[in-house]
Amino acid sequence: MNPAALAKQPRRRWLELRFLASVCAAASALWAFIELAESVVEGETHTLDLAVLMALRTAGNPDDPLGPRGMEQFARDITALGSPGVLTLLVIAASVFLLLARHHRSALLVLAATGSGALATRLLKLSFDRPRPELIPADIYISTASFPSGHAMGSAFVYLTLGALLAQASTNQRLKLYVLGVALTLTGVVGISRIYLGVHWPSDVLAGWAAGAFWAIAWWALAHVVRREAPPGSNALPDRRLG
């Protein structure tokens, strides 16, 4: 074996370990979603769901979220970061950038992962058709079922997909951790805002996070396979820098 091939072996082993870790993470997220779904269908989460929601409401006035008025407005601003409109604009902007940078497969990955994720979210909501909490403010428009939370699931598969792409484009470990941390934080605060506003049961949000994480990780595991099988010099998914 030539020296160049020997030098590549540690990196290949690391990529294989990372692939196995992603498969395990995806399987864990899927398992968590299935367990939550079964508990919701059987009514096992209702008592805890209601207790958490009521703990976040003003005593004697369940229509009013806990805290100052500005807190509710802040939660509405945060929850907008997980809205279909905002997430769609982010996906379009990222995809156009990747296409202009000639990273066509990366653009295809983003579009496929997020587009199929949006479809999966819709199908899951139709399948479970869980009623929303009765605490929803009258001025918040709701048109879909409660389980799983679309904002939580959409934020997970969009922000985690884009975060993983940006992290992969950097060779700086601290930058990688920062980008992934931002993606996780955005996903987390969007989900929490849905509970605080009373538009979702806590189990809806947990299930949305689990399903969205599974979707994002599963697509990146697929991307690993595509990258590994791509011939040398092909326009595969970027390993280091974008642009």
Predicted regions and their residues:
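N-terminal transmembrane-helix/juxtamembrane module of multi-pass inner/ER membrane proteins
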Residues: 1-85, 128, 132-139
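Arginine residue identity/basic-tract feature
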Residues: 11-13, 18, 57, 69, ...
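Hydrophobic alpha-helical membrane segments, chiefly transmembrane helices and signal peptide h-regions
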Residues: 17-41, 81-99, 108-127, 156-164, ...
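Membrane-interface loops
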Residues: 46, 50-60, 64, 89-173, ...
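Membrane-embedded catalytic cores of phosphoryl/pyrophosphoryl-handling enzymes
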Residues: 133-243
